Amino acid sequence: MRLNIGHIKGQELERPMPSAIVRNLERRAAQEAVDAAVAVLDLNFEQLADTLQVDRRTVYRYRKRQTVPTPEVRRRFDMLREIIQLLEEIFAKPEDRHEWMYRSVPLLRGRRPIDLMLKAELEPIVEILAGYQAGAHI
């Protein structure tokens, strides 16, 4: 991440953002993603740990902003945030989002999205939701 420090003769000057600031931003992003997963997807910490492929205690530390996610976990958080955003855009009611997550979906060969999520298989869920958002039949 880079920090814009001004302009000289139309050129933007940048310097690397201090690592402490980056770590704080990453901790906050992880905490917000945990909160969103609990609120929107109704996941508990154990389910979220399975989704992120981390220990349940690590999820607790993310929630308390005590640790920075690894690059791989950040990637999973990114996909999880995308799933949450797409679900909120596609399904207006929380109960409709919940029903979709827990029912068999033909495009997932009859599997339930929650089952894929708990195995950290997030890409197919993102792809299907993005297709729905683009106008594919639900």
Q: Language-model segments: which ranges?
A:
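Non-transmembrane "mature" sequence context
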Residues: 1-138
